[in-house]
Design a protein with these regions (language model features):
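C-terminal catalytic/motor cores of large multi-domain enzyme assemblies
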Residues: 1-199
Length: 199
């Protein structure tokens, strides 16, 4: 790997997200990761630099928000791609994700080479935080940890909450630190106010 990685960690207060996920999954068979992918797609629309690929020493901006979803197989990791993820609602994104993950397990990788951004999630294994390596020629990847129970102090009172740590890795040739921080803050804001994801 010759990509100059820059890492940025944010902690999402995920209580509302977890409650919305529990409420929604009875109608739509979705995962927490589907909400994260949707939040990333929404944020990428605001930050065109995150639609870029670095190829042959050139930055190429894509018109499409194509998001890769990392899938672990027995012999390694593959990244099928949700093409035009920003144009899907939660139901269609969740259904399409299930199809491309199943295809990947059967040896067919959807959208190969079309991705501009990847979401990788190890939360189901209890991993709370980790850093991921960018999937070239993409310029960024978001590593998502488990939602965990925690406490916070509000007006000197202790309250129960849920937290989720995300680590953003960006290619420093394409995206600078300030842009990365703004993007991570946008994803965090969307996930902390997740009702906008099911409108």
């Amino acid at each position: 790997q010759h990509i100059p990685h820059f890492y940025l960690k944010v902690v999402v207060e995920a209580k509302k997200l977890f409650e919305l996920y529990k409420k929604t999954k009875s109608q739509i068979p979705c995962s927490v990761n589907d909400f994260v992918v949707m939040a990333c797609a929404m944020a990428i629309r605001q930050f065109p630099a995150f639609r870029s690929q670095y190829k042959n020493s050139q930055i190429i901006e894509s018109e499409n928000v194509n998001i890769g979803v990392a899938v672990g197989l027995d012999d390694g990791l593959v990244v099928p791609v949700l093409v035009d993820a920003d144009k899907m609602n939660l139901s269609s994104l969740s259904a399409r994700t299930k199809v491309i993950v199943e295809n990947a397990r059967n040896g067919k990788i959807d959208g190969m080479g079309k991705g501009i951004f990847t979401v990788t999630n190890l939360g189901m294994f209890g991993t709370e935080e980790f850093s991921a390596i960018i999937n070239p020629p993409e310029s960024a990847i978001l590593a998502v940890g488990a939602i965990r129970e925690d406490i916070k102090v509000v007006n000197e009172s202790i309250k129960a909450t849920r937290l989720m740590t995300m680590t953003l890795s960006v290619d420093h040739r394409v995206i600078d630190g300030v842009m990365a921080a703004k993007f991570a803050a946008a994803v965090k804001e969307i996930l902390e106010n997740p009702e906008q994801l099911i409108k």
